[in-house]
Amino acid sequence: MALRACGLIIFRRCLIPKVDNNAIEFLLLQASDGIHHWTPPKGHVEPGEDDLETALRETQEEAGIEAGQLTIIEGFKRELNYVARNKPKTVIYWLAEVKDYDVEIRLSHEHQAYRWLGLEEACQLAQFKEMKAALQEGHQFLCSIEA
């Protein structure tokens, strides 16, 4: 049976869009262990917890962002399936916008750094193709609902 985890692809809208019109920035966290990969906050589902509760709890634990500081974007949910440490893993992601552009990020011991990045930079740091695809799909979804 696959390990199950859930998380939020957190973004903010730039106050002044950059020249390349990259008005959306994604939050990525750098893991403290292993290959120090960059991902949005995520974690394993606890017994009795539903998937979205897990995503919100993990975001609070890993980045210090509480549920009340976020707006979950309706209509976007992605399931990533891959192998991690020789075991199948499923990760469910939702899109969430921070309500405050300057929200304080407080990292847990599981992460050593964070960055707000435009789509292209975020995809360069996200080493796994499934994660890159989820970021691209999230960006495309956000652009489609703004139009």
Swiss-Prot record:
Q: Reaction catalysed by this chain?
A: P(1),P(4)-bis(5'-guanosyl) tetraphosphate + H2O = GMP + GTP + 2 H(+); a 5'-end CoA-ribonucleoside in mRNA + H2O = a 5'-end phospho-adenosine-phospho-ribonucleoside in mRNA + (R)-4'-phosphopantetheine + 2 H(+); a 5'-end FAD-phospho-ribonucleoside in mRNA + H2O = a 5'-end phospho-adenosine-phospho-ribonucleoside in mRNA + FMN + 2 H(+)
Q: Domain named Nudix hydrolase: which ranges?
A: 1-139
Write down which residues bear the modification named N-acetylalanine: 2
Any one Gene Ontology MF annotation carried by this entry is: GTP binding
Q: Which segment of this protein is annotated as the motif Nudix box? A: 43-64
What exactly does this protein do? Catalyzes the asymmetric hydrolysis of diadenosine 5',5'''-P1,P4-tetraphosphate (Ap4A) to yield AMP and ATP. Exhibits decapping activity towards FAD-capped RNAs and dpCoA-capped RNAs in vitro.
Organism name? Homo sapiens
Record PROSITE patterns: NUDIX (PS51462), NUDIX_BOX (PS00893)
Q: List required co-factors.
A: a divalent metal cation
Which cellular component terms (GO) are annotated to the entry?
Answer: mitochondrial matrix
Classification via InterPro entries: NUDIX_hydrolase-like_dom_sf, NUDIX_hydrolase_CS, NUDIX_hydrolase_dom, Nudix_hydrolase_domain, Tetra_PHTase
* Record-stated family: Belongs to the Nudix hydrolase family.
The catalytic activity of this protein is classed by the Enzyme Commission as: 3.6.1.17
Signal peptide limits: none
What keywords appear on the UniProt entry?
Acetylation, Disease variant, GTP-binding, Hydrolase, Intellectual disability, Neuropathy, Nucleotide-binding
Tell me the Gene Ontology biological-process terms attached to this UniProt entry: AMP biosynthetic process; apoptotic process; ATP biosynthetic process; cellular response to oxidative stress; nucleobase-containing compound metabolic process
Reported disease = Intellectual developmental disorder with or without peripheral neuropathy: An autosomal recessive disorder characterized by global developmental delay appearing in infancy or early childhood, intellectual disability, and progressive sensorimotor neuropathy with associated distal weakness. Affected individuals have hypotonia and delayed walking with an unsteady gait and frequent falls. Additional features may include dysarthria and subtle facial dysmorpism.
Question: What is the name of this protein?
Answer: Bis(5'-nucleosyl)-tetraphosphatase [asymmetrical]
| Cofactor: binding comment | Divalent metal ions.
**PANTHER family on file:** BIS(5'-NUCLEOSYL)-TETRAPHOSPHATASE [ASYMMETRICAL], DIADENOSINE 5,5-P1,P4-TETRAPHOSPHATE PYROPHOSPHOHYDROLASE MUTT
